[in-house]
Structure formats: structure tokens, C-alpha cells
Amino acid sequence: MAPAADMTTAPTGVRSDEPPASAFSKPGGGLPVAAAMGGEEESDKPKVSPSPLPFSVEALMADRRKPPGGRDGPEGSGPPLGSARANLGALTTEAPTSPLPLGGHFPSVGALGKLPEDALLKAESPEKPERSPWMQSPRFSPPPPRRLSPPACTLRKHKTNRKPRTPFTTAQLLALERKFRQKQYLSIAERAEFSSSLSLTETQVKIWFQNRRAKAKRLQEAELEKLKMAAKPMLPPAAFGISFPLGGPAVAGASLYGASSPFQRAGLPVAPVGLYTAHVGYSMYHLT
């Protein structure tokens, strides 16, 4: 115990010539040197108190309750809001497509705690993803709805230099009809005299007679068609007109079953075969 006594009696600041005590020797305090060194290292490290996660419900509610200007503790000593937003923008611009960096460093919990509240809220509730640039191009955008234009008129277009239609009066029409019944074709002298009496031109009278003759021809053809349809007999189709001798099958049946049938009725006199043959449809048509 002599070295321990010398060390205690030696004044402070004076270098001792004795060799330093080994790590396994017990000093006067009774604790090993390694334990003392470990205690010093642990005392140098700051003790981190367990704090709730910044994205938990309690942390968000506590941040909202605090006034915006009076933040204390580790959050108040962090970087300003502008620098935090700049760091967040840099992180989003570097890897917009990959949610987790591959081969890089993950942001620490302390860095997440220093982020502003707006950034955390946006990270938790992301908005709808924007359309990619290739979808915004007009090549992939849906075509606008087409408005259906009205169909073009398919009526016959008249000539531009066409003369207007002549409006005949009732007296003129009656005189023209009366003259047409008397004579359908007028001579040049008759047409000139008749047009002057009606205060019309010869061309107007001539065109009216031409149209009236065409109309009379159409009416005459329609009347002839009606007469032809009425003159045709209303006969049944030829498929049902089967000719066979009257009484032929009855005679054959009587000769075949006459002896064996006790309830045979007396048959009517039948004419010889082939004497009276008639078309069934024709006979029924004339009998009715």
C-alpha cells in the first residue's frame, strides 16, 4: 500500500517518477481505472430524453396548441423556417419518383423533428398526383367532342336566272280550263287572241297548255291501270288447282271395302271415269 500513500501525499501538478498504475490495480478509491474512464466518457455524452415522434398525434396536437412565435426547447433552437423549406424542396427535387433513396442516407429523426408542421401535414396527406408531362401533351389528350353539323340540303338547286312563277288569278285559271276542254292544241293565231283576252303573254299560255297536257296524260294512264286491275279475275293460285275425276276414289273404296263392311251405305250413281273432270278451284269459284 506504499504506492497509494505516495500518490496521495504527492502535491498536485508535480510529475511523479513512479510508473503509472496498471488498469488491473485498485486505486485508493476502490474502483478500477477503466470504469472511471468509462464514466467520464458517458458524462461527456449528452443525455437524450425520450421524446415523442414528431408525426404522432400527441406531437401534432402539442405543436398546434403552442403559439407560433414562442417555441422553446430543441425545436426553437432549430434552423429557421425558410431553410427547412429549402431543404425539403431539395429532397423532393432530387428523387421525385423514388419514395426511399437507394444507397443513400435516410433522414434522421432529429431532422424530421426540425421540419415545419405544414411539411409534415403535406407528407401525411398527399394531394392527388399531378398528371405526367406525357399525358399533358396534346397527342395523348382526348379529342374534343365534335359538334354534329346539320345535313346539307339535297334539294335540287334552281338556276339563278330562273323566271319567277306566274301567279294566275282564279278567273284566268277558269278560262284556261274551259279553253283546254274545248281544244288541247291552239294555233298561233288562237293563242295570240286568247292570251290578249286574258292579259297574259303567248309564252305563259303556251307553257300552261303544255303542263296541262302532261297532267291529263298522267291521269289517263292512272285510269287505265285501274281498269286493268279491276278486269283481272280473282282466281286462286295454280298450286291448289288439282284435277281428279269425280267419284274415282269413292268407287275404288266401295269396291275394296264393300264386302267386308256391314254398314255400307248405298252409293250414288257415279259417272264413268274420265267423263266429267273439273278443276276444283274453278268449280268452287263458279259455284259461289
UniProtKB/Swiss-Prot annotation:
SMART domains: HOX. Residues 1-12 have a biased composition (Low complexity). It is found in: Nucleus. Residues 161-220 bind DNA. GO terms for biological process: activation of meiosis; anterior/posterior pattern specification; BMP signaling pathway; bone morphogenesis; cartilage morphogenesis; cell morphogenesis; cell surface receptor signaling pathway involved in heart development; embryonic forelimb morphogenesis. Its main location: nucleus. Gene3D superfamilies: Homeodomain-like (1.10.10.60). Pfam families: Homeodomain. One of its GO terms (cellular component) is nuclear periphery. Residues 1-111, 123-152 are annotated as: Disordered. InterPro entries: HD, HD_metazoa, Homeobox_CS, Homeodomain-like_sf, Msh_Homeobox_Regulators. It comes from the Eukaryota. GO terms for molecular function: cis-regulatory region sequence-specific DNA binding; DNA-binding transcription activator activity, RNA polymerase II-specific; DNA-binding transcription factor activity, RNA polymerase II-specific; DNA-binding transcription repressor activity, RNA polymerase II-specific; p53 binding; RNA polymerase II transcription regulatory region sequence-specific DNA binding. Keywords: Developmental protein, DNA-binding, Homeobox, Nucleus. Probably plays a role in patterning events during embryonic limb development. May also be involved in programmed cell death. Belongs to the Msh homeobox family. This is Homeobox protein GHOX-7. It comes from Gallus gallus. The lineage of its organism: Eukaryota, Metazoa, Chordata, Craniata, Vertebrata.
